[in-house]
């Protein structure tokens, strides 16, 4: 089961832009709890605490128990907005979670054994094409990461969604077999491969070309005794 974090909030008696600005001036972030067939509940959260939660990472995949007027509300953040200049939170939305609820979330990918991949050892670079996978899972069992083992990838090879083992109960939303990771060759690698192939082909052709004169010489040698015999007569 995913770890549930605690978060304190205060009910907002008023909504609207003016009330939201007043909350921000008081050092609080306006927000709302909605969903689970219940009316929306305007709230406010202390700005320093919310900022700390956001900066800690994985905010949008963390389940919270919000304490509000003596009651706890099981929620998950669905969106937040930051000030475009000062980069502090100015609004937050929470989705209320009912018992046994499932949810769609985006789970980050964590790479395993990237340093031992054959393609990396030959000078390639790991390119994480997709940083997170959209999945559906139980709200109480959201994985922190989806692990992708790239330890066997050769140069120019890729790891796809079908190559990754998802945790039990986690279903991908994508229908196509997406490319998650590729090993990108270093600059000039394609030319080196072509040059090596050309050299190998030339090396194979050289003995065949050298065999023709030998056959001709053998034929000439076969005629020599006949000519010599005529002279002896």
From Swiss-Prot:
Keyword rRNA-binding assigned: yes
Source species of the chain: Nitrobacter hamburgensis (strain DSM 10229 / NCIMB 13809 / X14)
Protein name: Large ribosomal subunit protein bL25
Matching HAMAP family: Ribosomal_bL25_CTC
InterPro entries (alphabetical): Rbsml_bL25/Gln-tRNA_synth_N, Ribosomal_bL25/Gln-tRNA_synth, Ribosomal_bL25_b-dom, Ribosomal_bL25_C, Ribosomal_bL25_long, Ribosomal_L25_dom, Ribosomal_uL5_bac-type
Keyword line: Ribonucleoprotein, Ribosomal protein, RNA-binding, rRNA-binding
One of the GO BP terms on file: translation
Pfam families from the UniProt entry: Ribosomal_L25p, Ribosomal_TL5_C
Subunit structure: Part of the 50S ribosomal subunit; part of the 5S rRNA/L5/L18/L25 subcomplex. Contacts the 5S rRNA. Binds to the 5S rRNA independently of L5 and L18.
Record function comment: This is one of the proteins that binds to the 5S RNA in the ribosome where it forms part of the central protuberance.
GO CC terms of this entry: cytosolic large ribosomal subunit
Residues covered by region (Disordered): 1-23
């Amino acid at each position: 089961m995913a770890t549930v974090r605690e978060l304190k909030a205060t009910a907002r008696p008023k909504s609207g832009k003016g009330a939201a600005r007043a909350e921000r001036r008081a050092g609080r972030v306006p927000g709302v709890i909605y969903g689970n067939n219940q009316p929306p509940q305007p709230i406010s959260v202390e700005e320093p605490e919310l900022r700390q939660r956001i900066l800690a990472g994985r905010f949008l995949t963390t389940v919270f128990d919000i304490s509000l007027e003596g009651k706890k509300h099981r929620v998950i953040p669905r969106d937040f907005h930051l000030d475009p200049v000062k980069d502090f939170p100015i609004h937050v939305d929470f989705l209320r979670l009912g018992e046994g609820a499932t949810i769609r979330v985006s789970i980050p990918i964590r790479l395993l054994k990237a340093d031992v991949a054959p393609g990396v050892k030959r000078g390639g670079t790991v390119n994480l094409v997709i940083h997170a996978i959209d999945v559906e899972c139980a709200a109480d069992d959201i994985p922190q990461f989806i692990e992708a083992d790239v330890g066997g990838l050769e140069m120019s090879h890729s790891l796809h969604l079908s190559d990754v083992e998802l945790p039990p109960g986690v279903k991908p939303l994508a229908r196509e077999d997406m490319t998650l990771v590729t090993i990108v060759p270093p600059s000039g690698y394609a030319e080196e491969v072509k040059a090596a192939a050309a050299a190998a082909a030339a090396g194979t052709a050289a003995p065949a070309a050298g065999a023709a004169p030998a056959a001709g010489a053998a034929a000439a040698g076969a005629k020599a005794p006949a000519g010599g015999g005529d002279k002896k007569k």
